[in-house]
Amino acid sequence: MFNDEARLKLLEGVNTLADAVQVTLGPKGRNVIIKETHLTKDGVSVAKAVKLDDPIANIGAQFIKNASSKTCDDAGDGTTTATILTRAIIQEGMKYLATGVDPYTIKKEIDSDVKIVTEYINSIKQEIDLNKIKQIATISANNDESIGDLLANAYEKIGKDGIITMEENKGSDTYIRVVEGI
């Protein structure tokens, strides 16, 4: 399988995974059932559950999984947004490849656009307060206000430069433990 046929198969995988994940976007995102037993609105969980039979399409899906996993690792959220943006970048890149633009030029343009978007985001960013942190955390926790309260309390205790690490608890209690640094 070469060129156009392979690109179409890759794009098929990208689209299949992105279609499954994009419905979870934002506070009004919909739930997705995974294997009859798991109901989730978490984009990264949906992405991890997608397995495609076609190996080339599966590589395309893996592009999306890698982007969403990296976003989750770096930011702790935003996996659905990363999925949607990655798909859009891949789709546009494929269009340019089909018209004969070389991959290096496409990459240079993407890098240039990333710089422009980053500068714009930095120009409109806003400081947030504990109430906003609570709102964001609540939304990220599928509207669980107790988690929103907990994270807002954690930020209040550690300050804006502190680091929060979450660990799974074997018990049923959810709690904060502050560990002083050096």
Segments and roles (model prediction):
Residues 1-180:
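N-terminal glycine-/lysine-enriched basic segments
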